[in-house]
Amino acid sequence: MHVFLLKNNMYKPLFNQCKALRFRHFSRKRYALFACVGRVVTIGVLSVATLKSAAATTTDDISVVGATTSAASDDDAPDKEATLDEVEVTGSRAPLALGQAARMVTVLSREDIQAASVQSINDLLKIAVGVDVRQRGPIGAQTDVTIRGGTQEQITILLNGINICDPQTGHNAFDLPCDVSDIVRIEVLEGPAGRVYGTSSLVGAINIVTSPSDLSGKNGREGEKAESDEEGQNNVLFRLEGGSFGYLSAAGRLSLLSRPSSLLSNISASYTRSDGYQRSKNGHLNSDYSGGKVFYQGSIPLSSEQSSVVSKISWHAGLSIKGFGSNTFYSAKFDEQYEKTLKLYTAVQGEVAVGRLHFRPNVYWNRGYDRFELIRGSEERVPFNHHRTDVFGLNLNSWFDWVAGRTAFGAEFRNEDIRSTNLGEPLSEPFSYYKMGLNRSNISLHLEHNILLKRFTLSAGFIAVKNTWNEMPLTVYPGIDASLRLGSHWKLYASYNSSLRMPSFTELYYSVGGHKADKHLKPEELRAVEGGVKYSNSLLTLQAGIFYHHSRNLIDWVMDTRDSEAVWQSVNHTKVNTLGQEFNATLHVKRMMLHLAYCHLHQSKDEASYLQSQYSLEYLRHKLTAQLQVHLFSALNLSVNYRFQDRMGTYTTIDGDIRSYHPYSLLDARLNWQKDSYSIYIQGNNLTNHRYVDYGNVPQPGFWLVAGAKYNIKL
């Protein structure tokens, strides 16, 4: 099975991939061998200018791995280095080599991120054809992200594999503490992912990977470099950019490696602000934004030279704080809303290998604060809403190899707590703003087995879930994936998976401001089947798939449009069925890359015509994306992104009229002058100045111009 190295490929759909390690020299350290476990090892350096095709194969029935790249045809083309295999992703509990696993994973690499015309992590996901990104404000002020026709509550957001979902509301899920420059890659797993990422991954999961690079070149998993990292070098990265609507963003990143202990530390900080692109009826700013982030991460090997146990530990801690004009986010009748959030993230992750047995324990704690003002700065007229959430979790994933394949098992405990002015049950001892609250715990067990043959892989398992809030017994959600490799270019895959999601605290208790919640909502459940085919050679990659989702008890906010005094109510939809098709094509020709993708969805639900949906039934019927990346000359590169979206559903205007969502197209472009130590760029978003909405009554900005520069200093 050949694996093709795709340079600057925006949102490559990939199957689980095994990290290829490249050794420039041997360190004779025990943890260097540990880094090789489950990965392909290559020795030496291969230049793109001389490498046409290379392949590495095993002599047993476990894996066949290779690589192909296009040679540089021009003398002035940048001289780049390529390894045989660039990305390791996880679509199963047990790590599997590329070409073995059946789950489809979409990967956005470091190079793709640098080429994108975006100001936030949220904007990066718009290019993934199966992902729906609905914005209520610019530069990541508030963004709802979902997959394959779901809602923002139905996906799991992970930071380095740690679940950071907010049990209060999915609206705050993307308050990430890391800057774009911290990211190594973004992984998108489409479809139910319960047995891989646990509960809340009803329609999929998104994993933001910021793991620090090992500048010594000895750590395999961390061998992928973030933007400022240079192998063997401590360094500092600076970024400064500005643009339309008073936009300004500054960031810095420091990477340090302590040679005696191999302790790696990365710390980053960023600040972003904007005046916004419109004003309220009273002439006040109502789409302004300001926010800052601080993020620290580190790792260190713990094994000694003589130890037979190989281990390492990594950790991260981060802070995200932002305030933004909420425009007409939650009510068209009030156009001076405001919201401020603060998020704290901490996690410690371990990895231990004892012979064939591997352990990956994790412990994490996240805290969030949220203050919402219906009338900005006027608490006397309408009291502010205050919320504080705490999430504590313990997770253990283990696996071992034996004659029948690879088996994974483990467990997770997650406790979710909220203190609020209006969410939850009355507290016995109120304090500060908080008079209401709720606490619930989720316990899950998982088991998975993988049968690995030369051309066939079968992965089957289940997750068993029990939540203290709900009266349902311990419930099992199974899944099975299969893939068949036909020759060196074709792959067939099929899967059946199931998952569930507990209601958020907002869905259970938010009964203010024209909303009425139901605290007796049932958990959502989904079962899905999927099948597809993938073809790839040195120039072309094609992938086509079809999927069917059968959902029970989907949660939504609905309103009876016949009643002028009606309020939004949280309800369970009995059944919702979704049929979808996806197609991806990528072409590489010398200095150019062209990527086209299309997704079509159709949902069937016996719903009364007078009921208006706020989330579940407002899905993208059609989404088309196109990316063109061209190396113009010398160090100058051009990236052009196009997106067409056609959304189902309706919304009620401030005048009481019911309107359907209209399809729209957006065109973005970026020119980048890239040298070894610096880059200068200019980009334009919404070049045609098109007026559109992702949510009713919340207009999005028109043409937005941004220019910036980055500079990397080796210490």
PLM-predicted stretches and their roles:
Residues 90, 122, 126-162, 166, ...:
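Extracytoplasmic beta-strand/coil segments of soluble accessory domains associated
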Residues 163-192:
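Short acidic/polar hinge/loop motifs at secondary-structure boundaries
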Residues 194-195, 215-225, 241, 252-341:
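Periplasmic-side early beta-strands and strand-to-turn transitions of outer-membrane beta-barrels
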Residues 452-458, 548-550, 571-653, 688, ...:
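Gram-negative outer-membrane beta-barrel transporters
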Residues 550-552, 644-651, 669-715:
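C-terminal beta-signal and adjacent terminal beta-strands/loops
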